[in-house]
Amino acid sequence: MAALSKSIPHNCYEIGHTWHPSCRVSFLQITWGALEESLRIYAPLYLIAAVLRKRKLEYYLYKLLPEILQSASFLTANGALYITFFCILRKILGKFYSWTPGFGAALPASYVAILIERKSRRGLLTIYMANLATETLFRMGVARGTITTLRNGEVLLFCITAAMYMFFFRCKDGLKGFTFSALRFIVGKEEIPTHSYSPETAYAKVEQKREKHKGTPRAMSIIALVRTLVDSVCKHGPRHRCCKHYEDNCISYCIKGFIRMFSVGYLIQCCLRIPSAFRHLFTEPSRLLSLFYNKENFQLGAFLGSFVSIYKGTSCFLRWIRNLDDELHAIVAGFLAGVSMMFYKSTTISMYLASKLVETMYFKGIEAGKVPYFPQADTIIYSISTAICFHAAVMEVQNLRPSYWKFLLRLTKGRFALMNRKALDVFGTGASREFHNFIPRLDPRYTVVTPELPIDFS
Protein backbone atom coordinates (compact mmCIF):
# COMPACT_ATOMS: atom_id res chain seq x y z
CA MET A 1 0.00 0.00 0.00
CA ALA A 2 1.35 3.38 -1.02
CA ALA A 3 2.27 5.67 1.85
CA LEU A 4 -0.63 7.98 2.67
CA SER A 5 1.72 10.91 3.32
CA LYS A 6 3.42 10.80 -0.09
CA SER A 7 2.17 13.52 -2.45
CA ILE A 8 2.66 15.03 -5.92
CA PRO A 9 2.26 18.76 -6.76
CA HIS A 10 0.31 18.31 -10.04
CA ASN A 11 -3.04 20.07 -10.44
CA CYS A 12 -6.37 18.49 -11.43
CA TYR A 13 -5.82 19.27 -15.14
CA GLU A 14 -2.47 17.48 -15.18
CA ILE A 15 -3.84 14.33 -13.51
CA GLY A 16 -7.60 14.15 -14.11
CA HIS A 17 -9.32 16.08 -16.91
CA THR A 18 -6.30 16.11 -19.23
CA TRP A 19 -8.50 16.64 -22.30
CA HIS A 20 -9.44 20.21 -21.21
CA PRO A 21 -7.79 22.61 -18.71
CA SER A 22 -11.11 24.03 -17.44
CA CYS A 23 -12.77 22.26 -14.51
CA ARG A 24 -16.20 23.64 -15.45
CA VAL A 25 -16.01 22.54 -19.08
CA SER A 26 -14.75 19.09 -18.05
CA PHE A 27 -17.62 18.79 -15.56
CA LEU A 28 -20.18 19.64 -18.25
CA GLN A 29 -18.64 17.19 -20.72
CA ILE A 30 -18.65 14.36 -18.17
CA THR A 31 -22.21 15.20 -17.10
CA TRP A 32 -23.58 15.25 -20.63
CA GLY A 33 -21.84 12.02 -21.61
CA ALA A 34 -22.96 10.25 -18.43
CA LEU A 35 -26.57 11.43 -18.85
CA GLU A 36 -26.69 10.23 -22.44
CA GLU A 37 -25.31 6.80 -21.51
CA SER A 38 -27.54 6.53 -18.42
CA LEU A 39 -30.68 7.07 -20.49
CA ARG A 40 -29.50 4.42 -22.96
CA ILE A 41 -29.11 1.97 -20.09
CA TYR A 42 -32.22 2.67 -18.03
CA ALA A 43 -34.85 3.46 -20.70
CA PRO A 44 -34.93 -0.05 -22.27
CA LEU A 45 -34.29 -1.69 -18.89
CA TYR A 46 -37.33 -0.13 -17.22
CA LEU A 47 -39.49 -0.62 -20.32
CA ILE A 48 -38.71 -4.34 -20.55
CA ALA A 49 -39.23 -4.74 -16.79
CA ALA A 50 -42.63 -3.02 -17.06
CA VAL A 51 -43.70 -5.33 -19.89
CA LEU A 52 -42.57 -8.47 -18.04
CA ARG A 53 -44.39 -7.36 -14.88
CA LYS A 54 -47.54 -6.60 -16.92
CA ARG A 55 -47.84 -3.06 -15.65
CA LYS A 56 -51.09 -1.19 -16.22
CA LEU A 57 -51.50 1.82 -18.52
CA GLU A 58 -51.31 4.26 -15.58
CA TYR A 59 -47.74 3.15 -14.89
CA TYR A 60 -46.61 3.91 -18.45
CA LEU A 61 -48.34 7.30 -18.39
CA TYR A 62 -47.35 8.60 -14.96
CA LYS A 63 -44.53 6.52 -13.40
CA LEU A 64 -42.28 5.06 -16.11
CA LEU A 65 -40.62 8.30 -17.25
CA PRO A 66 -40.03 9.69 -13.71
CA GLU A 67 -38.41 6.40 -12.63
CA ILE A 68 -36.16 6.36 -15.70
CA LEU A 69 -35.11 9.97 -15.11
CA GLN A 70 -34.49 9.38 -11.41
CA SER A 71 -32.21 6.39 -12.00
CA ALA A 72 -30.47 8.17 -14.88
CA SER A 73 -29.91 11.20 -12.62
CA PHE A 74 -28.37 8.96 -9.96
CA LEU A 75 -25.90 7.40 -12.38
CA THR A 76 -25.10 10.76 -13.98
CA ALA A 77 -24.50 12.33 -10.58
CA ASN A 78 -22.14 9.53 -9.62
CA GLY A 79 -19.88 10.35 -12.56
CA ALA A 80 -20.29 14.13 -12.57
CA LEU A 81 -19.80 14.56 -8.82
CA TYR A 82 -16.67 12.41 -8.93
CA ILE A 83 -14.86 14.85 -11.22
CA THR A 84 -16.26 17.71 -9.09
CA PHE A 85 -14.82 16.39 -5.82
CA PHE A 86 -11.64 15.41 -7.67
CA CYS A 87 -11.03 19.09 -8.46
CA ILE A 88 -12.28 20.38 -5.10
CA LEU A 89 -9.94 18.11 -3.11
CA ARG A 90 -6.95 19.25 -5.18
CA LYS A 91 -7.82 22.91 -4.59
CA ILE A 92 -8.32 22.38 -0.84
CA LEU A 93 -5.22 20.23 -0.22
CA GLY A 94 -2.96 21.93 -2.78
CA LYS A 95 -1.55 18.59 -3.96
CA PHE A 96 -2.51 14.97 -4.66
CA TYR A 97 -2.05 12.19 -2.10
CA SER A 98 -2.36 8.48 -2.87
CA TRP A 99 -5.96 8.36 -1.62
CA THR A 100 -7.36 11.59 -3.13
CA PRO A 101 -7.63 10.81 -6.89
CA GLY A 102 -9.70 7.68 -6.32
CA PHE A 103 -11.19 6.90 -2.92
CA GLY A 104 -11.22 10.46 -1.59
CA ALA A 105 -13.11 11.94 -4.55
CA ALA A 106 -15.45 8.98 -5.10
CA LEU A 107 -16.65 8.60 -1.48
CA PRO A 108 -18.63 11.87 -1.15
CA ALA A 109 -19.72 11.67 -4.81
CA SER A 110 -21.18 8.18 -4.32
CA TYR A 111 -22.89 9.14 -1.06
CA VAL A 112 -24.69 12.11 -2.61
CA ALA A 113 -25.54 10.15 -5.78
CA ILE A 114 -27.17 7.18 -4.02
CA LEU A 115 -29.48 9.56 -2.15
CA ILE A 116 -30.97 10.54 -5.52
CA GLU A 117 -31.90 6.93 -6.36
CA ARG A 118 -35.17 5.38 -5.20
CA LYS A 119 -34.96 3.58 -1.84
CA SER A 120 -36.36 0.39 -3.34
CA ARG A 121 -33.29 0.08 -5.61
CA ARG A 122 -30.60 1.05 -3.11
CA GLY A 123 -30.40 -2.41 -1.56
CA LEU A 124 -29.77 -4.15 -4.90
CA LEU A 125 -27.17 -1.57 -5.92
CA THR A 126 -25.46 -1.92 -2.54
CA ILE A 127 -25.25 -5.71 -2.87
CA TYR A 128 -23.78 -5.43 -6.36
CA MET A 129 -21.17 -2.82 -5.43
CA ALA A 130 -20.26 -4.56 -2.16
CA ASN A 131 -19.71 -7.76 -4.14
CA LEU A 132 -17.57 -5.91 -6.69
CA ALA A 133 -15.56 -4.12 -3.98
CA THR A 134 -14.90 -7.38 -2.13
CA GLU A 135 -13.65 -8.98 -5.33
CA THR A 136 -11.47 -5.93 -6.02
CA LEU A 137 -9.95 -5.97 -2.53
CA PHE A 138 -9.27 -9.69 -2.91
CA ARG A 139 -7.42 -9.08 -6.18
CA MET A 140 -5.45 -6.27 -4.56
CA GLY A 141 -4.45 -8.60 -1.75
CA VAL A 142 -3.36 -11.29 -4.20
CA ALA A 143 -1.34 -8.75 -6.22
CA ARG A 144 0.45 -7.63 -3.04
CA GLY A 145 1.08 -11.18 -1.86
CA THR A 146 -0.95 -10.75 1.35
CA ILE A 147 -3.62 -13.22 0.18
CA THR A 148 -2.99 -16.60 -1.41
CA THR A 149 -5.48 -17.90 -3.95
CA LEU A 150 -7.33 -21.13 -3.29
CA ARG A 151 -7.80 -23.48 -6.22
CA ASN A 152 -11.51 -23.71 -7.12
CA GLY A 153 -12.20 -21.22 -4.34
CA GLU A 154 -15.31 -19.92 -6.11
CA VAL A 155 -16.71 -23.46 -6.16
CA LEU A 156 -16.06 -23.93 -2.43
CA LEU A 157 -17.70 -20.58 -1.67
CA PHE A 158 -20.70 -21.58 -3.78
CA CYS A 159 -20.95 -24.93 -1.95
CA ILE A 160 -21.09 -23.20 1.44
CA THR A 161 -23.54 -20.59 0.17
CA ALA A 162 -25.79 -23.22 -1.44
CA ALA A 163 -25.79 -25.27 1.77
CA MET A 164 -27.01 -22.30 3.81
CA TYR A 165 -29.54 -21.18 1.21
CA MET A 166 -31.08 -24.65 0.95
CA PHE A 167 -31.24 -24.94 4.73
CA PHE A 168 -33.16 -21.66 4.97
CA PHE A 169 -35.33 -22.81 2.07
CA ARG A 170 -36.31 -25.95 3.97
CA CYS A 171 -36.94 -24.11 7.24
CA LYS A 172 -40.32 -22.56 7.96
CA ASP A 173 -40.22 -18.81 7.18
CA GLY A 174 -36.53 -19.21 6.33
CA LEU A 175 -36.71 -17.39 3.01
CA LYS A 176 -39.26 -14.99 1.58
CA GLY A 177 -40.04 -13.16 -1.61
CA PHE A 178 -38.06 -13.58 -4.80
CA THR A 179 -35.34 -15.80 -3.30
CA PHE A 180 -37.88 -18.35 -2.07
CA SER A 181 -39.76 -18.30 -5.40
CA ALA A 182 -36.53 -18.73 -7.37
CA LEU A 183 -35.40 -21.74 -5.32
CA ARG A 184 -38.87 -23.28 -5.51
CA PHE A 185 -38.69 -22.96 -9.29
CA ILE A 186 -35.21 -24.52 -9.41
CA VAL A 187 -35.53 -27.47 -7.02
CA GLY A 188 -39.32 -27.87 -7.06
CA LYS A 189 -42.04 -27.53 -4.46
CA GLU A 190 -41.66 -31.19 -3.48
CA GLU A 191 -38.69 -30.23 -1.30
CA ILE A 192 -40.68 -27.77 0.82
CA PRO A 193 -41.56 -29.37 4.20
CA THR A 194 -44.89 -27.54 4.48
CA HIS A 195 -45.88 -28.68 0.99
CA SER A 196 -49.54 -29.72 1.01
CA TYR A 197 -49.24 -32.09 -1.92
CA SER A 198 -50.85 -35.29 -0.57
CA PRO A 199 -50.99 -38.76 -2.17
CA GLU A 200 -54.75 -38.37 -2.58
CA THR A 201 -54.46 -35.14 -4.58
CA ALA A 202 -51.67 -36.65 -6.66
CA TYR A 203 -53.84 -39.65 -7.48
CA ALA A 204 -56.75 -37.37 -8.33
CA LYS A 205 -54.58 -35.38 -10.74
CA VAL A 206 -53.41 -38.55 -12.45
CA GLU A 207 -57.03 -39.69 -12.83
CA GLN A 208 -57.94 -36.30 -14.34
CA LYS A 209 -55.13 -36.69 -16.87
CA ARG A 210 -56.39 -40.16 -17.80
CA GLU A 211 -59.94 -38.86 -18.27
CA LYS A 212 -58.58 -36.11 -20.47
CA HIS A 213 -56.63 -38.52 -22.68
CA LYS A 214 -59.61 -40.86 -23.14
CA GLY A 215 -61.31 -38.45 -25.52
CA THR A 216 -58.25 -37.84 -27.72
CA PRO A 217 -58.36 -38.92 -31.38
CA ARG A 218 -56.50 -41.94 -32.73
CA ALA A 219 -53.69 -39.79 -34.10
CA MET A 220 -52.70 -39.00 -30.52
CA SER A 221 -52.86 -42.60 -29.35
CA ILE A 222 -49.12 -43.21 -29.92
CA ILE A 223 -48.19 -40.15 -27.87
CA ALA A 224 -50.65 -41.21 -25.18
CA LEU A 225 -49.14 -44.71 -25.18
CA VAL A 226 -45.63 -43.32 -24.75
CA ARG A 227 -46.83 -41.08 -21.93
CA THR A 228 -48.53 -44.00 -20.22
CA LEU A 229 -45.39 -46.11 -20.55
CA VAL A 230 -43.18 -43.34 -19.12
CA ASP A 231 -45.64 -42.73 -16.27
CA SER A 232 -45.71 -46.41 -15.38
CA VAL A 233 -41.90 -46.60 -15.35
CA CYS A 234 -41.67 -43.46 -13.19
CA LYS A 235 -44.28 -44.63 -10.69
CA HIS A 236 -43.14 -48.23 -10.29
CA GLY A 237 -39.84 -47.88 -8.51
CA PRO A 238 -38.25 -47.08 -5.15
CA ARG A 239 -39.75 -44.10 -3.33
CA HIS A 240 -39.38 -43.50 0.39
CA ARG A 241 -42.52 -42.81 2.38
CA CYS A 242 -41.12 -39.39 3.39
CA CYS A 243 -40.56 -38.34 -0.22
CA LYS A 244 -43.25 -36.02 -1.55
CA HIS A 245 -42.65 -36.62 -5.26
CA TYR A 246 -45.73 -38.85 -5.49
CA GLU A 247 -45.78 -39.09 -9.29
CA ASP A 248 -42.18 -40.30 -9.57
CA ASN A 249 -39.83 -42.76 -7.97
CA CYS A 250 -36.58 -41.37 -6.60
CA ILE A 251 -34.54 -42.23 -9.70
CA SER A 252 -36.92 -40.69 -12.27
CA TYR A 253 -37.39 -37.72 -9.92
CA CYS A 254 -33.66 -36.90 -10.15
CA ILE A 255 -33.48 -37.55 -13.90
CA LYS A 256 -36.49 -35.33 -14.63
CA GLY A 257 -34.99 -32.58 -12.47
CA PHE A 258 -31.75 -32.73 -14.47
CA ILE A 259 -33.48 -32.65 -17.86
CA ARG A 260 -35.75 -29.76 -16.87
CA MET A 261 -33.05 -27.45 -15.51
CA PHE A 262 -30.55 -28.44 -18.21
CA SER A 263 -33.11 -27.23 -20.76
CA VAL A 264 -33.65 -24.00 -18.81
CA GLY A 265 -29.91 -23.28 -18.60
CA TYR A 266 -29.38 -24.10 -22.28
CA LEU A 267 -32.22 -21.80 -23.38
CA ILE A 268 -31.06 -18.95 -21.11
CA GLN A 269 -27.57 -19.02 -22.62
CA CYS A 270 -29.03 -19.20 -26.14
CA CYS A 271 -31.20 -16.14 -25.48
CA LEU A 272 -28.20 -14.21 -24.16
CA ARG A 273 -26.31 -14.92 -27.38
CA ILE A 274 -29.16 -13.96 -29.75
CA PRO A 275 -28.29 -10.20 -30.03
CA SER A 276 -24.64 -10.83 -30.94
CA ALA A 277 -25.61 -13.62 -33.37
CA PHE A 278 -28.14 -11.51 -35.30
CA ARG A 279 -25.73 -8.57 -35.41
CA HIS A 280 -23.51 -10.70 -37.67
CA LEU A 281 -26.39 -12.40 -39.51
CA PHE A 282 -25.51 -11.07 -42.97
CA THR A 283 -21.74 -10.76 -42.63
CA GLU A 284 -21.13 -14.13 -40.94
CA PRO A 285 -24.22 -16.41 -41.29
CA SER A 286 -22.27 -19.34 -39.82
CA ARG A 287 -22.49 -17.62 -36.42
CA LEU A 288 -26.14 -18.67 -36.18
CA LEU A 289 -25.00 -22.26 -35.70
CA SER A 290 -22.85 -21.21 -32.76
CA LEU A 291 -26.04 -19.90 -31.16
CA PHE A 292 -27.16 -23.49 -30.59
CA TYR A 293 -23.88 -25.43 -30.59
CA ASN A 294 -21.89 -23.34 -28.16
CA LYS A 295 -19.87 -24.75 -25.28
CA GLU A 296 -21.21 -22.18 -22.80
CA ASN A 297 -24.81 -23.21 -23.54
CA PHE A 298 -24.11 -26.77 -22.45
CA GLN A 299 -21.98 -25.65 -19.50
CA LEU A 300 -24.78 -23.56 -17.97
CA GLY A 301 -27.26 -26.35 -18.65
CA ALA A 302 -24.97 -28.92 -17.03
CA PHE A 303 -24.45 -26.62 -14.03
CA LEU A 304 -28.16 -26.07 -13.34
CA GLY A 305 -29.18 -29.62 -14.24
CA SER A 306 -26.55 -31.31 -12.10
CA PHE A 307 -27.23 -28.92 -9.19
CA VAL A 308 -30.88 -29.97 -9.07
CA SER A 309 -30.26 -33.68 -9.65
CA ILE A 310 -27.49 -33.87 -7.01
CA TYR A 311 -29.61 -31.96 -4.50
CA LYS A 312 -32.67 -34.13 -5.09
CA GLY A 313 -30.65 -37.35 -5.19
CA THR A 314 -28.85 -36.55 -1.94
CA SER A 315 -32.11 -35.56 -0.23
CA CYS A 316 -33.76 -38.83 -1.26
CA PHE A 317 -30.70 -40.83 -0.21
CA LEU A 318 -30.66 -39.23 3.25
CA ARG A 319 -34.37 -39.92 3.66
CA TRP A 320 -33.73 -43.58 2.90
CA ILE A 321 -30.71 -43.77 5.23
CA ARG A 322 -32.21 -41.91 8.20
CA ASN A 323 -35.84 -42.91 7.59
CA LEU A 324 -37.04 -39.33 8.15
CA ASP A 325 -37.24 -35.95 6.43
CA ASP A 326 -35.12 -33.33 8.17
CA GLU A 327 -34.20 -29.71 7.35
CA LEU A 328 -30.58 -30.56 8.16
CA HIS A 329 -30.51 -32.79 5.08
CA ALA A 330 -30.60 -29.60 3.01
CA ILE A 331 -27.16 -28.54 4.34
CA VAL A 332 -25.51 -31.74 3.10
CA ALA A 333 -27.51 -31.84 -0.14
CA GLY A 334 -26.91 -28.15 -0.86
CA PHE A 335 -23.16 -28.42 -0.23
CA LEU A 336 -22.78 -31.44 -2.52
CA ALA A 337 -24.98 -29.82 -5.16
CA GLY A 338 -22.66 -26.82 -5.12
CA VAL A 339 -19.93 -28.97 -6.70
CA SER A 340 -21.95 -28.61 -9.92
CA MET A 341 -20.33 -25.19 -10.37
CA MET A 342 -17.30 -27.06 -11.72
CA PHE A 343 -19.24 -27.07 -15.01
CA TYR A 344 -19.71 -23.28 -14.99
CA LYS A 345 -17.14 -21.57 -12.77
CA SER A 346 -18.08 -18.00 -11.95
CA THR A 347 -16.57 -15.83 -9.23
CA THR A 348 -19.28 -13.24 -9.91
CA ILE A 349 -22.14 -15.67 -9.19
CA SER A 350 -20.44 -17.04 -6.06
CA MET A 351 -19.67 -13.60 -4.65
CA TYR A 352 -23.12 -12.22 -5.44
CA LEU A 353 -24.96 -15.13 -3.81
CA ALA A 354 -22.65 -14.98 -0.79
CA SER A 355 -23.37 -11.25 -0.44
CA LYS A 356 -27.11 -11.89 -0.65
CA LEU A 357 -26.75 -14.61 1.98
CA VAL A 358 -24.98 -12.21 4.35
CA GLU A 359 -27.78 -9.70 3.77
CA THR A 360 -30.42 -12.36 4.50
CA MET A 361 -28.69 -13.45 7.71
CA TYR A 362 -28.26 -9.81 8.77
CA PHE A 363 -31.99 -9.11 8.45
CA LYS A 364 -32.80 -12.36 10.24
CA GLY A 365 -30.56 -11.20 13.07
CA ILE A 366 -32.45 -7.91 13.19
CA GLU A 367 -35.80 -9.75 13.33
CA ALA A 368 -34.49 -11.90 16.18
CA GLY A 369 -33.25 -8.82 18.02
CA LYS A 370 -29.65 -10.05 18.08
CA VAL A 371 -28.17 -7.60 15.57
CA PRO A 372 -28.59 -3.80 15.70
CA TYR A 373 -30.31 -2.04 12.82
CA PHE A 374 -28.41 0.74 11.04
CA PRO A 375 -30.83 3.01 9.12
CA GLN A 376 -28.20 4.30 6.65
CA ALA A 377 -26.28 1.02 6.28
CA ASP A 378 -27.07 0.54 2.58
CA THR A 379 -26.07 4.13 1.73
CA ILE A 380 -22.79 3.92 3.64
CA ILE A 381 -21.86 0.48 2.27
CA TYR A 382 -22.64 1.60 -1.29
CA SER A 383 -20.52 4.74 -0.89
CA ILE A 384 -17.49 2.90 0.51
CA SER A 385 -17.78 0.05 -2.02
CA THR A 386 -18.05 2.42 -4.99
CA ALA A 387 -15.13 4.48 -3.68
CA ILE A 388 -12.98 1.32 -3.50
CA CYS A 389 -13.86 0.43 -7.10
CA PHE A 390 -13.15 3.98 -8.33
CA HIS A 391 -9.84 3.95 -6.48
CA ALA A 392 -8.91 0.74 -8.28
CA ALA A 393 -10.01 2.25 -11.60
CA VAL A 394 -7.61 5.17 -11.05
CA MET A 395 -4.67 3.59 -9.24
CA GLU A 396 -4.64 -0.10 -10.26
CA VAL A 397 -7.15 -0.92 -12.97
CA GLN A 398 -5.54 -4.36 -13.41
CA ASN A 399 -7.26 -5.41 -10.18
CA LEU A 400 -10.72 -4.21 -11.24
CA ARG A 401 -13.29 -6.46 -12.89
CA PRO A 402 -12.92 -5.86 -16.68
CA SER A 403 -16.68 -5.54 -17.25
CA TYR A 404 -16.92 -2.72 -14.69
CA TRP A 405 -13.96 -0.91 -16.25
CA LYS A 406 -15.69 -1.07 -19.64
CA PHE A 407 -18.83 0.32 -18.01
CA LEU A 408 -16.86 3.29 -16.60
CA LEU A 409 -15.39 3.95 -20.04
CA ARG A 410 -18.89 3.94 -21.55
CA LEU A 411 -20.19 6.27 -18.84
CA THR A 412 -17.39 8.81 -19.38
CA LYS A 413 -17.14 8.39 -23.17
CA GLY A 414 -13.65 6.96 -22.78
CA ARG A 415 -12.32 9.91 -20.74
CA PHE A 416 -11.52 7.75 -17.71
CA ALA A 417 -8.65 6.26 -19.72
CA LEU A 418 -7.18 9.74 -20.41
CA MET A 419 -6.01 10.33 -16.83
CA ASN A 420 -2.28 10.90 -16.37
CA ARG A 421 -1.59 7.61 -14.62
CA LYS A 422 2.11 7.86 -15.47
CA ALA A 423 2.39 10.59 -12.82
CA LEU A 424 0.55 8.37 -10.32
CA ASP A 425 3.14 5.58 -10.61
CA VAL A 426 5.13 7.20 -7.79
CA PHE A 427 2.58 5.78 -5.33
CA GLY A 428 3.71 2.25 -6.20
CA THR A 429 0.44 0.73 -7.44
CA GLY A 430 1.42 0.36 -11.09
CA ALA A 431 -1.27 2.81 -12.19
CA SER A 432 -0.05 3.05 -15.81
CA ARG A 433 0.64 -0.67 -16.27
CA GLU A 434 -2.41 -1.33 -18.47
CA PHE A 435 -2.13 1.90 -20.47
CA HIS A 436 1.09 1.23 -22.40
CA ASN A 437 2.89 4.25 -20.90
CA PHE A 438 0.21 6.65 -22.13
CA ILE A 439 1.24 10.30 -21.55
CA PRO A 440 -1.33 13.02 -22.26
CA ARG A 441 -0.43 16.15 -24.22
CA LEU A 442 -0.86 19.12 -21.87
CA ASP A 443 -0.92 22.87 -22.30
CA PRO A 444 2.12 24.15 -20.32
CA ARG A 445 0.28 27.41 -19.58
CA TYR A 446 -2.03 25.54 -17.16
CA THR A 447 0.41 23.10 -15.57
CA VAL A 448 2.39 23.19 -12.33
CA VAL A 449 4.98 20.62 -13.42
CA THR A 450 6.58 20.87 -16.86
CA PRO A 451 4.69 18.30 -19.01
CA GLU A 452 6.54 15.45 -20.70
CA LEU A 453 4.49 15.98 -23.88
CA PRO A 454 3.58 19.69 -24.14
CA ILE A 455 1.12 20.85 -26.79
CA ASP A 456 2.98 22.31 -29.77
CA PHE A 457 1.33 25.65 -30.65
CA SER A 458 3.44 26.19 -33.76
UniProtKB/Swiss-Prot annotation:
Q: What Pfam families does the record point to? A: Tim17, TMEM135_C_rich
Inducing or repressing factors: Up-regulated following cold exposure and upon fasting.
Q: Which UniProt keywords apply?
A: Membrane, Mitochondrion, Peroxisome, Transmembrane, Transmembrane helix
According to the UniProt entry, its GO molecular function terms are:
lipid transporter activity
Question: Alphabetically, which GO biological process terms does the record hold?
Answer: alpha-linolenic acid metabolic process; determination of adult lifespan; fatty acid derivative biosynthetic process; fatty acid derivative transport; long-chain fatty acid biosynthetic process; long-chain fatty acid transport; mitochondrion organization; peroxisome organization
* Cellular compartments per GO CC: cytoplasm; lipid droplet; mitochondrial membrane; mitochondrion; peroxisomal membrane; peroxisome
Where is this protein localized, as stated in its record? Answer: Mitochondrion membrane; Peroxisome membrane
- Any phenotype upon disruption? Age-dependent pathologies, characterized by accelerated aging in the retina similar to macular degeneration of the retina. Retina show higher sensitivity to oxidative stress. Defects are caused by impaired balance between mitochondrial fusion and fission.
Record's bilayer topology term? Multi-pass membrane protein
Q: Which InterPro entries does the annotation name?
A: Tmem135, TMEM135_N
Membrane-crossing segments per the record = 68-88, 96-116, 149-169, 298-318, 331-351, 377-397
Domain of life here? Answer: Eukaryota
Function, as annotated: Involved in mitochondrial metabolism by regulating the balance between mitochondrial fusion and fission. May act as a regulator of mitochondrial fission that promotes DNM1L-dependent fission through activation of DNM1L. May be involved in peroxisome organization.
> What is the similarity comment for this entry?
Belongs to the TMEM135 family.
Its recorded name reads: Transmembrane protein 135
Could you tell me which species this protein originates from?
Mus musculus
